[in-house]
């Protein structure tokens, strides 16, 4: 659908590429909302969130996402009730998943004030923010130039920490009217149940729920939970300890089987082998009754 189209995906060619489905949720009635999209590599996809907070006179957007038609429509519905978008905040120094959409999102809301974290950088090439389409004439640096909406928001810097190629720094926000702490990368909460966003496209879950590439993608509740648990391990560790990479002959032996010769199934190529104990490792990261908080 046209309202899910993201034409700038080649700048950061991550799944699901040019089609970005969005889930809109109200987190705290009348105060806080979220927009979530999937993003990942080789079906290692996790939700990425834009948070919308009510501030005096309008709205504040925190952590930009690609402004697809769905995103703009959801924000427009909130603007009708709560006022226009007054500010857009990029609270982290790195992280292209939020930095690249900032320029297009800023153009979608030309009256909004832009705020970015100090020490902006990117890897492998650190480009000036203006090269990424971020309008310099209405962009301010958090803390250096003040903070947005100080009457209702308290801002605190986590870092900076020197990473060698750049630095980690995140400016987090306590939104007093809702009592919510807005944190991007420093803190995550993970549930054993897959996020609702996967209901729109469970392919990443089903792909990683398998043991070998010649197994079909079968959609069951058990397969979804198993696939999500493995995605949690990938997202937390990149190379989880209970994971092996099969040899090339073994990989090819299970590939290109009938029923799997499609892009969706990656033609049966599944370069992972999970060792015993992987489920216990995943269980230690997830909560059953409520999301388990993890410090990143």
Residues of each region from the PLM?
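Catalytic core of the metallo-beta-lactamase
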Residues: 1-73, 127-217, 233-243, 247-248
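Acidic, low-complexity intrinsically disordered regions
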Residues: 2-5, 29, 111, 151, ...
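Residue-identity detector for glutamine
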Residues: 4, 31, 37-39, 73, ...
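A residue-identity detector for tryptophan
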Residues: 6-9, 33, 115, 121, ...
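Cap/insert and terminal regions of metallo-dependent hydrolase folds
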Residues: 57, 65-66, 76-87, 93-108, ...
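Active-site HxH/HxHxD metal-binding segment of metal-dependent hydrolases
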Residues: 77-148
